[in-house]
UniProtKB/Swiss-Prot annotation:
<keyword id="KW-0234">DNA repair</keyword>
<feature type="binding site">
    <location>
        <position position="852"/>
    </location>
    <ligand>
        <name>Mn(2+) 1</name>
    </ligand>
</feature>
<dbReference type="InterPro" id="IPR049132">
    <property type="entry name" value="FAN1-like_euk"/>
</dbReference>
<feature type="binding site">
    <location>
        <position position="833"/>
    </location>
    <ligand>
        <name>Mn(2+) 2</name>
    </ligand>
</feature>
<feature type="binding site">
    <location>
        <position position="712"/>
    </location>
    <ligand>
        <name>Mn(2+) 2</name>
    </ligand>
</feature>
<dbReference type="InterPro" id="IPR049126">
    <property type="entry name" value="FAN1-like_TPR"/>
</dbReference>
<dbReference type="GO" id="GO:0005634">
    <property type="term" value="C:nucleus"/>
</dbReference>
<dbReference type="Pfam" id="PF08774">
    <property type="entry name" value="VRR_NUC"/>
</dbReference>
<dbReference type="GO" id="GO:0003676">
    <property type="term" value="F:nucleic acid binding"/>
</dbReference>
<dbReference type="GO" id="GO:0004528">
    <property type="term" value="F:phosphodiesterase I activity"/>
</dbReference>
<dbReference type="InterPro" id="IPR014905">
    <property type="entry name" value="HIRAN"/>
</dbReference>
<keyword id="KW-0227">DNA damage</keyword>
<keyword id="KW-0479">Metal-binding</keyword>
<feature type="domain" description="VRR-NUC">
    <location>
        <begin position="770"/>
        <end position="884"/>
    </location>
</feature>
<dbReference type="GO" id="GO:0036297">
    <property type="term" value="P:interstrand cross-link repair"/>
</dbReference>
<dbReference type="Pfam" id="PF21315">
    <property type="entry name" value="FAN1_HTH"/>
</dbReference>
<keyword id="KW-0378">Hydrolase</keyword>
Amino acid sequence: MLTGRESLLRLIGKRRRFLPNRHLLLSAHTPNSLNLEFNDYGNLVSLAGDDCRLSEDPTSSDDPSKFSDDLSLSTRKKRRLTQTTLLQSSFLSVPKQLEDGLVICTQQKSILDSETFEFSLVQRSEPSESICCKVEDGSCSPSREESLKTVTLDEDNGEAIETFIVGRKFSDVQDLEIGGDIFLLRHPENVKDRNAIKVISGDSEMLGYLPKDISQCLSPLIDDYDLKFEGTITSVPKKSSEAVLIKVVCHKMRSDGWKECELYGDFKPLWEKVLQVVEHQMQFPPKTTRYQLNFNVLLQEVLRSCSHLFTADEKAFLESFPTLSEDSQRLFIRLYTRKGPWFRLSNISYPEVTDSLQALKDLTVRGFMSSVKDANELDNQKMKEITELLNVTELRDILSMNKVFSRTSRKRDLINSLCSCYNDGTRINLATVILERTGLCAKVSSTAESLIWRVERLFFLNGEQDLSSFVLLDLGIIKYPTYKCIDSEQIFSNRTKLLAYEEAIEVAQLMDESLDNEDPQTVLKCIIIAETRISSSSLDSAHAAAFNRFTAPWVNSKVVLLGVSFFENQKRYNRAVYLLRRLLSCFNCDGRRGYWTVRLSTDLEHMGRPNESLTVAEQGLLDPWVRAGSRVALQRRILRLAKPPRRWKTPTFSNLVDNKIPEVTIQGRSLNCEVGIKNRFYGEDGEQCGVEQLALQYYSGEGGGWQGIHTESSIWLTIFGLLMWDILFSDVPGVFQTRFQTAPLDLETESFYLTRKETIESQLEKVANGMAEEILIISYETQRGTACRGVAWERFSLEELRAAVACVGGMCIASLCRHLAQDYRSWCSGMPDLLVWRFKENGYEGEAKLVEVKSEKDRLSEQQRAWLLLLMDSGFNVEICKVRPASLIKT
């Protein structure tokens, strides 16, 4: 895989089915900054026309077809996407009011031709991609209209609230009547819910319970303030097992009792919480499925906090979703979370959707879905997509009708044969035949796809999380830490910046797809687009460092860096050099500058320019953003290149770089010694093992009786997370934007340490003074299982973590944590493979050693070397363990 592609995949997340700007990005003219004349140094010397040739290779040009023949992309593995089924969760929010009537027509303009991006919603040129929906006053079903009643205050009898009776399976009475009297009774003996509240009939018969969310808020008030509730049944469902709508009133305990209750400090906020929960529940009654509730909460949260990023028409369209019927909402969410893009109605069946056909019709009318049932509605693209819905048997049957016979059982080959028939005008109308097989087909409309994708992106702020995150939370598979979301500045201050960011992610996805499809023309096009977007852009210095990753220039820089790897893989180093210089000139304060500088120096050397390579390396050491492994790499390059007559003076850092790291060599019986394959050995017990396990066996035996584990960076990031837990999740404005974060947004920036310097240093002083183990135990026991960046709960026991902290020592642990706090991004990887320790006879004091294990043909990376040198300087006991295969003895 090309360097930088894995990072790009994480940025993209789940691929979008519809890219609004795909055609415009690939067809519009883009200033070709790579269509330039280079000299032997890889420097731009003059503008060139379309026939420009690179000095490195006179046969190459910027026409992708000129160099596509020698691309070696066939070894790239295609990414597989997995689909998560939504289940349940609980996530509350107060929704916006719905607008009654609207008409929406949408279109997105190109943002290629100007610096200012103005997207408006107007009629699309393709009828199938346009939406026109009208929300009538009576669009809500009767049951939903009834559930949208507001909470009122009855001045004579007290506070009236509307809610439901649930848990009807526990009822003593099956048949209920509208107007029947009811009373509320606490049920603290309920072993499943100590806050349970029973609903009792006028004859003292059990009717069910109040919903759990309301009981949780209301039960403390009943217990502490002796509140009494009675009311009536206001609606009876068709099925006796369904929830029953009721209205209950809290009577005054005496003539002035209500005001007396309000005098207590805790009463008012608790009662307001009850009203909030009641209001939310009436918006989403018990019959609302969990994934349906989560989806609506997603919409409401984003529309509440990011309304300035949507046009009036877009907001109206999204706000119309809750007015859809229950079936329509459920069907849309189900289909949106599936791969698609097209679905056969005959294959759509969900137990919670009673009428899929009617739901689909409603969704199509309202613009959330597009459907096709007439062959005249199919163009070539839709035709290709719908053929994917046919199975192998259906494909063979259709081909046989055209007297095309194929022995292959591969679906892709059959589809290609079918499409070739469709392109041949002499054949029968395949569109009609295919639709006869598939029946009515539907897909999520492009407008809904684009807007819901934006909502998810704004809610989760990444491409790796989606609606399935609610499922993980509800099932207890993941537990998020407790923190406060303190608003400061907006991540996207205006719509223009958001649209530029979205377009950059589109370019990134196009780049990824083109690499999968071995399409060099599109690869080059994406590189050019991304390079053009950063040519006149740089990260806003006033923008918080934690928010830089949400800018278009930052995303485009990821595409450009992948382009560097692409050109390096093709040995077109002058193009890679040009792109690296563009990155270095546009991003002056970026932790990636170190890697870019190393690549620039290396590529210049590949071009036969050692003097310039040396100069770049020397200038890189003056850059404060060149750190950790990149800094060591440049120092080692300088020592290698700065030989007389290029340089006569020995660099001052030569002694530091050449600092001797202790080594030990052991032998093992090798199972394989092939280059490029991870070495396997026979362990002391005769079982196969890796090189790290073999080293652990050595240290536990003749190496000195050490205990140990194979940890790499994981144990140190875990210790850092536990020791700094309260600081990581402290109240800092702006760093927590969503409820699904495992770390503050600024963790990998300089601002993390600078903003919290006083508290960090205070905590590190405690660690250095011997309190590390105590802090570790408290964090481990109180936060166990809670997700936190870097903390690997499943890998290490508390005993192993305590041993590591106790044997390494407080001073060393504090030094390591300080480096991670100051520059987490640079130091979060590359730590030694093994941690070994042994206690002294008293059982409390001990010693530890960090070991980097290398096989015979393996060598240290620059990041690993940087860590070993840093650890030695901080007082750690470190060692390199080299494993060599033992000589084979013939018997």
